[in-house]
Amino acid sequence: KLEPGEPIAIIMDQTLTQDATGTMAYLQLEAMGVDQVQTELSVSYVDHNTLQSGFENADDHKYLQTVAEKHGVLFSRPGNGICHQVHLECFAKPGKTLLGSDSHTPTAGGIGSLAIGAGGLDVACAMAGRPFHLRMPSVIGIELKNELRQGVSSKDIILKVLQLLSVKGGVGRVMEYFGDGVKTLSVPQRATITNMGAELGATSSLFPSDERTLEFLRQQGREEDFEALEADPDAQYEKVITIDLAQLEPMIALPHSPDHVCTVREVEGMKIDQVCIGSCTNSSYHDLVSVGNIVKGKHVHKDVSLTVSPGSRQIFKELADNGTLSDLIEAGARILECTCGPCIGMGQSPITEAVSLRTFNRNFYGRSGTLSAKVCLVSPETAAYSALCGELRSPLGLTYEVPKEPAFMKSDRAMFIAPKPAEEAKDVTVVRGPNIRPLPVNTPLPDMIDKKVMIKVGDNITTDHIAPAGAKVLPYRSNIEKISTFVFMNNKADFHDCCKENGGGFIIAGANYGQGSSREHAALSPMYLGIKAVIAKSFARIHKANLINFGILPLTFTDESDYETIDEMDELRIEEIGSIHPGGKLSVYNVTKDC
């Protein structure tokens, strides 16, 4: 029944994984006993854990390469690029469904693909040919009118949407873009917008497939993949938001949330210490050539460190061929590998108390690797101009050459390793280094839980809070026992020890608990530590699904004021758990407070 809130199931045409979440997904696929994936296409990307300071990441990559060869999955080698940028260039198709073990999978919505982020177990099930289950989302229509002025970018569009809707405004919804302004945006510009639909909490974001889509597919040598798609003339939306692109100006998300948005003009002049340009949000050809044209013949301010991370090897090669790479180097930029890098705290942590301008999608507390840093999200144009000035500056009115897209861009298909044919695949040995640990197995929930509250947290707790990333933690994504020692490390340093001493217990949370990435480690690790239930005012979609997948009860307060009556280390009791059903009620008795 295609009505908002009703359960539905979708068969997925394509899947993608990245290495920080992929090892778990393929361990789960192996545990299912699946010989060959059942999708039209499944791709395993390596773009997160590329800082090889120990054997762990390299071991994970070898596991991913060999398990892909054995089970029919295409493998994208380290250095080939960020999964969403490469998938957009090489594989995403209008009208196809895509499920990815990364929350920014909806990037492909920029080409007209229904793309959804999910936990690794859901992606493993999709690879096994099983449908993806969710509740039918409602649809918000976003009408784009007119055309952007020079110095204003598609990043400013999505920051404006975040300002209007907040980080929970998209929960249970799909964002659908339409209007005469759509045709003024290229596919990569549209993909910037759909990418950050994840920050809205949206299930997906979608643009029509039109002549600009065909233009992009021709550029990539994939014209045969084109299919025209647009909303029905009588399409009905939950609500419609109209944005006049001609009136939009450069925007900025201030610390520590992507919806803490204002105009650059309102905070212009703020001294900055670091500028990082790249990520799956803003590392396209148009983005980076714009940056190159702004800094050409000039030099980065003496107090600013500027890094640039191309989104793919294809883009990196184009920058080298057209002279942009030379312009960036001469301007003082530090050129990084085609990976996620600083966006996930994998290197380039800023100085203490730094103000870091980043073209990324998230500025959560501590995500950069420096707890005291003030990370702000801006467009590539704002970032580049500010890097020259040493302070936040609006590029509105700045004169620079607007990039012209090449007619054709070549992909290096040698950076992909094809899976073995089914008969040969049987002989492939999957390589498992010592960092590849078996999946932890939960026990069935008892009919009664009597445990203490291990931690109480507020609103908008992210998966970065629950299961931090960064260079020190990410190498252990294949080792749940080890990575569990880092759970809530920046909120409650003794959380791990407290869980061990008490045999686990409860988590109490505010609204939008678990927003952010799709990392199922934010459910797996608490499960390993004995967490039986999370009681919150509300949940983010992907994290709630991950909690269910790993046997942790996601319970929502019927009366939000009850949140105030519970404290850390209170003993709570829940009975008759076996009677639970969707929409049903359970009573929680506070033994400590006798209420």
Task: Report each predicted region and the residues it spans.
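Fe-S-dependent hydro-lyases/dehydratases of central metabolism
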Residues: K1-C595
